[in-house]
């Protein structure tokens, strides 16, 4: 569903909030249900290191078909929606983005995006947002991809770690993929958002990983993740952090917070391989993840 159509049909129960320009969504006791897909990496190029770039389009279309058959409040993709060709041509990469975004928008409901590092490999954040049509467009802080919204009585917070150490945006490959940062202003914004969430159960979405305390490679983790995690742990209503970036997937937990890294849909040849999930979160804090393809099922009966 396009943003303009969604705003005409708010009866679905999801309402955007950060600038408080719209009424707030109220939960009705039923669980929040949403679809998750990450690391699509669509491009029209040859397979490399088990990444089947072109086949990612069919994988995503099949995932969207499954999402449409379920009763979902929204779908969120956790970054690296597109990739680029061997030449790194920006115009070509934008064509890839247009094609894969069209498939994602086949979902008949709200669609949200998270910025990944490959989304800025040869284009800018501004160009990425100009070629996507998610519900987040009116909520963005300039071109930075951090925003929040409410759905079914839950606060959902999306972070953007596509920044260099000096606070500059990732843009046209001016970065190294192992150096992802959350700038000070975004950490302050996160703290304010969590304060304003008050008693609302809260979910956090980000592309690069935050669970620095785990045994995952530090190359995959946001460099100042300890600062972000410290903020999350000060707010007891944070239930989970949902991440991408690490294509095999991963799980860890600390201080009552689940850190779930979903496997990348790009890995392996279609139709033998795919990976996406439907997540169900109950008001009491229990979480059920129904995985498809190479994505495992998970069930958490409350905070970690």
Task: Describe the function of each predicted region.
Residues 73-75, 202, 239:
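Conserved acidic residues
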Residues 197-213:
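Short acidic, glycine-rich surface-loop motifs adjacent to enzyme active sites
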Residues 87-201, 227-238, 248, 252-291, ...:
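Extended active-site neighborhood of metal-dependent phosphoesterases/phosphodiesterases
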Residues 1-2:
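N-terminal secretory signal peptides
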Residues 45-49, 86-87, 168-173, 214-216:
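Short acidic, glycine/proline-rich loop/turn micro-motifs
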Residues 5-25:
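N-terminal export signals
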Residues 24-91, 144, 192:
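N-terminal active-site segment of His-dependent metallophosphoesterases
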Residues 39, 79-80, 116-117, 207, ...:
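Active-site glycine-centered loops adjacent to acidic/histidine catalytic or metal-binding residues
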């Amino acid at each position: 569903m396009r943003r303009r159509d969604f705003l005409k049909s708010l009866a679905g129960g999801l309402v955007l909030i950060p600038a408080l320009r719209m009424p707030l969504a109220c939960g009705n006791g039923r669980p929040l249900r949403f679809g998750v897909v990450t690391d699509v990496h669509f491009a029209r190029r040859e397979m490399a290191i088990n990444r089947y770039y072109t086949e990612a389009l069919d994988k995503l279309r099949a995932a969207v078909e499954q999402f449409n058959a379920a009763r979902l409040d929204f779908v969120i993709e956790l970054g690296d929606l597109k990739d680029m060709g061997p030449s790194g041509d920006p115009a070509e990469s934008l064509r890839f983005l247009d094609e894969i975004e069209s498939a994602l928008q086949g979902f008949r409901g709200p669609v949200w995006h998270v910025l990944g590092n490959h989304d800025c490999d040869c284009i800018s954040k501004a160009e990425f947002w100009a070629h996507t049509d998610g519900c987040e467009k009116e909520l963005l802080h300039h071109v930075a991809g951090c925003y929040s919204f409410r759905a079914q009585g839950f606060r959902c917070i999306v972070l953007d770690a596509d920044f260099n150490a000096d606070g500059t945006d990732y843009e046209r490959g001016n970065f190294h993929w192992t150096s992802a940062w959350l700038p000070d202003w975004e950490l302050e914004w996160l703290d304010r958002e969590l304060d304003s969430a008050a008693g609302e159960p809260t979910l956090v979405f980000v592309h690069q990983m935050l669970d620095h305390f785990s045994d995952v490679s530090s190359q995959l983790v946001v460099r100042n993740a300890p600062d972000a995690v410290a903020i999350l742990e000060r707010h007891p209503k944070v239930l989970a952090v949902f991440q991408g970036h690490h294509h095999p997937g991963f799980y860890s937990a600390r201080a009552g917070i689940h850190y779930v890294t979903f496997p990348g849909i790009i890995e392996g040849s279609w139709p033998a391989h795919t990976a996406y999930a439907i997540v169900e979160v109950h008001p009491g804090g229990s979480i059920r993840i129904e995985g498809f393809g190479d994505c495992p099922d998970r069930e958490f009966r409350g905070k970690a």
